[in-house]
């Protein structure tokens, strides 16, 4: 389980932009589970960001067959992206993804306050 006391990883957005993350990239957890494929980013207003409350700036929407719908991974929890293998790894196990409730749409997205950014 990810706790408020766990260190917050660095935001992966600069790395993802540099490596040009593509739509339908395969997404895996640290324990090797196939989470799904990438769809788009959603950005939160900078004024509303508070990592201690788990209110992150950018989320990556992943279409997951394993979890039965969309999963919203905070960009801080992207571990690595290998464009040659078309593979992105999330810095969490499948159990941690489930425990963190990332399979629930964040409130700011549900209310239409998120800014979507389609992946190429």
List each model region and its residues.
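Peripheral interaction segments used for macromolecular assembly
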Residues: 1-120
């Amino acid at each position: 389980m990810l706790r408020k006391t766990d260190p917050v990883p660095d935001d992966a957005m600069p790395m993802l932009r540099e490596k040009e993350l593509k739509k339908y990239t395969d997404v895996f957890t640290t324990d090797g589970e196939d989470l799904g494929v990438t769809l788009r980013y959603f950005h939160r207003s900078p004024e509303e960001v508070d990592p201690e409350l788990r209110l992150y700036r950018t989320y990556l929407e992943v279409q997951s067959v394993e979890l039965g719908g969309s999963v919203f991974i905070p960009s801080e929890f992207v571990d690595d992206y290998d464009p040659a293998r078309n593979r992105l790894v999330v810095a969490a196990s499948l159990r941690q993804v489930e425990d963190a409730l990332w399979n629930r749409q964040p409130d700011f997205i549900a209310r239409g306050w998120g800014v979507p950014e389609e992946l190429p």
